[in-house]
Swiss-Prot record:
Its EC number is 7.6.2.-. This is Macrolide export ATP-binding/permease protein MacB. It is a multi-pass membrane protein. Residues 6-244 form the ABC transporter domain. Pfam families: ABC_tran, FtsX, MacB_PCD. Keywords: Antibiotic resistance, ATP-binding, Cell inner membrane, Cell membrane, Membrane, Nucleotide-binding, Translocase, Transmembrane, Transmembrane helix, Transport. The gene is macB. GO terms for biological process: response to antibiotic.
Amino acid sequence: MSDVLLKVEDLTRRFVSGDESLTVLNHINLEIKRGEMVAIVGASGSGKSTLMNVLGCLDKPSSGRYFINGQDVSTLESDQLAELRREYFGFIFQRYHLLGDLTAVANVEVPAVYAGVPHRQRTERAQSLLARLGLEDRLTHKPSQLSGGQQQRVSVARALMNGGEVILADEPTGALDSHSGQEMMALLKELHQLGHTIILVTHDMNVANFADRIIEIKDGEIIADTLNAQVVINEQAAKTPSASFHRPAQAVSKWWKWDSFIDALKMALLAMSSHRMRTFLTMLGIIIGIASVVSVVALGNGSQQQILSNISSMGTNTIDVRPGKGFGDRRSGRVKTLTADDAKSLESLPFVDSVTPSLSNSLTVRYANQDATASVEGVGEDYFRVRGYEIAKGQFWDEESVNSLAQEAVIDDNTRKEMFADRNPIGEVIFLGSLPVRIVGVTQKKEDAFGNSDALKIWVPYTTMSGRMMGQRYLNGITVRIDENAPSAAVEQSIINLLKMRHGTEDFFTINTDTIRQSIEKTTATMTLLISAIAVISLIVGGIGVMNIMLVSVTERTKEIGVRMAVGARQADILRQFLIEAVLVCLCGGIAGIGLAFLIGFAFSTSGSSFQMIYSMNSIIWAFICSTLIGIAFGFLPARNAAKLDPIEALARD
């Protein structure tokens, strides 16, 4: 194995700005062996930092070739360069570049996260490195709680985390006092003795004199490359690398993906918690949008259910036949062709379950010294089945009562309360106009389809109503109940055809509750869709807010992105981290929005509304899906911008 670790051949680096080109490195040739301690010295603007960036795979040459351990890396892509940074290099920056939200241990762990080292193993190694550097009592301290010298030692530990075969130190004493600076140089010298290849970049000859070899650079060219007076090259270390830079065992890909995801999730939570108010305001658009969608769907479901329930109170699967051409026909009162025989003939049609004739009038009902106005309806024995009424007390009359014109009545719960209070009305006699009738049954309370739930209702056999009370042979209407799964439109047409044949003309109209129900369902669905579309607009606005804040976050955390790239993060790692953060913000907003929707439902139910909001599990699931998709869609652009940052520019950003 060759002792040459890093080799540069005819390397040039130029920067182009518009029509101008600036050559920073000009045909550099350089070899650095394993175990050397090299100082690159030059004034500001000499090109020394650019050379360090190329050597550390943070930058690529414009021309020429660069070899690491015999491999030409001058044309590699960014992700391949990131892999080399993880495997070979550890960076010590003048300004430390520690991540302010992480503890000392967590900062040291960062390179190992991107190297795929399992959590437990990397934590143990980070703690061990910090202990060796005298920071065993500062493991859980954040950078703001450490002195400058302590922060620099944390950065040294981070550089050694993945082995640090080559340590690149950029002005390592520049931000330290003289005592801490001496300690840092002693530490680097110790690492050199352990076999690490140390490359110092400095303008200070006092620092450079710690190196075995001093390379002077001026105007992008190497003007001197000399050995120090007391050259001590650790030949043995070059042949046998020290245990201090043995790399931790690499994990399989699932560990790499999982730990990277967990790390990105933790960083997202830290970023959110460090800017709580901004995070909340970012979520607010998502919260309002999700709450609006879920609440609107719940309101639509609740109102639809209430309307359908009201329609059901008119009768389940019923078709009503009324005289005239339709509602509002002024001549309907003169149509006297609907008869009981028509009702009997309708019973013979297929899919017909039961039929009831009906006559109605408003009469005064009297009992003892009480009187009130009630709606009195003459109906057949099947009326209560057709309309879905249930008995509370007593019984309904039968066919014999209808045939015998029995003076029997069934009253509703409102009539019972009005006329009898707490007394049992069964067997009592009341007067309907001048006709006495005996109460045989009381129906259970039932909401009226049109909201007139306080009206008094009394039912008698239609024959009694026709023969004893009104003296008319024609009916006010016929109600037909059809089978549960019958095609209501076809049955309705059969009813029309039969009655047209019997009457010789169509002097009646029909009311199909199934048609009404379908129309209401379509109308409700359309209104729900319309209002939901408006709510979706607020979701989009919220998504734009997320994107804006994430763009701000990328700008604020540019240096953090540069540090992560320097220690080996690929573009995909940075993209994933910021994308997870955007999705997490939107998911939290979605959860809060669903919670707000339930609070709205609770307030709505306690406000005395006539119906309840009915929440749909589908709408809740879609709310989660939408919030996730919004996070991905509106978080992708900021995340991509973060991933495409140049690590050198990111590290230089203030």
